[in-house]
């Protein structure tokens, strides 16, 4: 049991939910009480004076591909020189290069490559991170990626949620045969992953260069049979109706959404599906069509913000910078950006016990060298993190 006193607390219970001169009582890894310190109930718990600093929920990065091997720096140089996607792929670049590097990496090597990325996230105030598979595209490597993700959660003070993304791309050994790939690799791997307790949700990529709506619908039907929630990369490069498809399957989230239309917005709103915005990919790909944030806002669709950390299209490991990008590129408000990396990000992962500072919630907290929560989106550069708590313990 402990008391954190002399705080400015952004509870995220109603907008920022700011409480000046606040205190938080923590017991058993959970928040027992929060409010003005003058009203703190009598307690013998030790008190930590936080010097008037800002406290928010620990941030949640709800969309990452943080487990992979290799880099795509050479491809980055090629693109800057004008190479097309096809030219990059012909030279051995693109997702296939990451798949080959990840397949070649053993579990220990993959873990060693991934931990520094996670450590950088934690230094930015992240307390929960979602990690996808999807760079194996064979049964063995997809499972290895998920096992490494689970291992990260054991080695670091961070809550890890895993998403099975076998339907990320069609690998070279199944080129032109996406249905066979789903039947021979994706669905068998998903069943093993579920049996081993390796997967928290099932994801897919619905796009002309990946999988069709019908193929994703088949995948989601199988996920539901396994009692697993679903989420979807949708409307990133074109509109195939992926967001509406996700909504019909009660998806936790639909992610990217640059080409989302009015029908898709309405479907997300009706289903309560979270729209996950990924400004890092928008920036890195130099896209020009932004997600319809004003329409999402007007429809009451909850909007989350994430890094989409991956080696090809968003080598971004700083959630604070993603918040700034969401504001400057997509015109979110700083309040929306913070909600998008706390309470709405939690919802995108199916979590109901984190993302706010309220009694009964996990005491996953971030203490910042800041006076107002808008500073977290305003800053560009190192995160002003003073301390982080994981389940009520300083880390």
Swiss-Prot record:
Record-level GO cellular component terms: cytoplasm
GO MF term list: imidazolonepropionase activity; iron ion binding; zinc ion binding
Binding site for Zn(2+): 63, 65, 233, 308
Keyword Transit peptide attributed: no
Pathway listed: Amino-acid degradation; L-histidine degradation into L-glutamate; N-formimidoyl-L-glutamate from L-histidine: step 3/3
Keyword terms, alphabetized: Cytoplasm, Histidine metabolism, Hydrolase, Iron, Metal-binding, Zinc
UniProt-annotated binding residues for N-formimidoyl-L-glutamate: 135, 310, 312
Cofactor(s) essential for the protein: Zn(2+); Fe(3+)
Gene3D superfamilies on file: Metal-dependent hydrolases (3.20.20.140), Urease, subunit C, domain 1 (2.30.40.10)
InterPro entries listed in its UniProt record: Amidohydro-rel (IPR006680), HutI (IPR005920), Metal-dep_hydrolase_composite (IPR011059), Metal_Hydrolase (IPR032466)
Co-factor note (free text): Binds 1 zinc or iron ion per subunit.
Sequence similarity: Belongs to the metallo-dependent hydrolases superfamily. HutI family.
Protein's job: Catalyzes the hydrolytic cleavage of the carbon-nitrogen bond in imidazolone-5-propanoate to yield N-formimidoyl-L-glutamate. It is the third step in the universal histidine degradation pathway.
HAMAP family according to UniProt: HutI (MF_00372)
Protein name listed in UniProt: Imidazolonepropionase
Organism: Cereibacter sphaeroides (strain ATCC 17023 / DSM 158 / JCM 6121 / CCUG 31486 / LMG 2827 / NBRC 12203 / NCIMB 8253 / ATH 2.4.1.)
